[in-house]
């Protein structure tokens, strides 16, 4: 419903750009000013994986020791 209402208003007010967003007061919204451009975060994700690895190793070690405590001990004959 909002898109149907805003499109005729934006086409009538600003002929320079076809896809202009208009707020409820009729002012054009420039997305470049409102939001920052997303950058490639691949290197950050790789860095996080390096940080998570030691934590996972600690969790696995803790689970292994708890599992050993629950198992019955085998006696040597």
Curated annotation (Swiss-Prot):
The keyword Protein biosynthesis does not apply. GO terms for cellular component: host cell Golgi membrane; host cell plasma membrane; membrane; viral tegument; virion membrane. It is a lipid-anchor. Myristoylation and palmitoylation (probably on one or more of the nearby cysteines at the N-terminus) enable membrane-binding and Golgi apparatus-specific targeting and are essential for efficient packaging. Its main location: virion. It comes from the Viruses. GO terms for biological process: viral budding from Golgi membrane. It is found in: Virion tegument; Virion membrane; Host cell membrane; Host Golgi apparatus membrane. Keywords: Host cell membrane, Host Golgi apparatus, Host membrane, Lipoprotein, Membrane, Myristate, Palmitate, Phosphoprotein, Virion, Virion tegument. Coiled coil: none annotated. A lipid is attached at residue 2 (N-myristoyl glycine). InterPro entries: Herpes_UL11_megaloV/roseoloV (IPR020170), HSV_CEP3_betahv (IPR034705). Belongs to the herpesviridae cytoplasmic envelopment protein 3 family. Plays an important role in the cytoplasmic envelopment of tegument proteins and capsids during the assembly and egress processes. Also participates in viral entry at the fusion step probably by regulating the core fusion machinery. Interacts with cytoplasmic envelopment protein 2; this interaction is essential for the proper localization of each protein to the assembly complex and thus for the production of infectious virus. This is Cytoplasmic envelopment protein 3. The gene is U71.
């Amino acid at each position: 419903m909002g898109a149907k209402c805003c499109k005729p208003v934006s086409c009538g007010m600003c002929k320079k750009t076809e896809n202009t967003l208009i707020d409820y007061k009729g002012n054009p919204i420039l997305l470049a000013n409102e939001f920052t451009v997303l950058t490639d975060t691949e290197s950050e994700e790789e860095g996080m994986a390096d940080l998570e690895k030691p934590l996972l190793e600690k969790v696995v070690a803790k689970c292994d020791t708890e599992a050993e405590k629950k198992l019955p001990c085998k006696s040597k004959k």
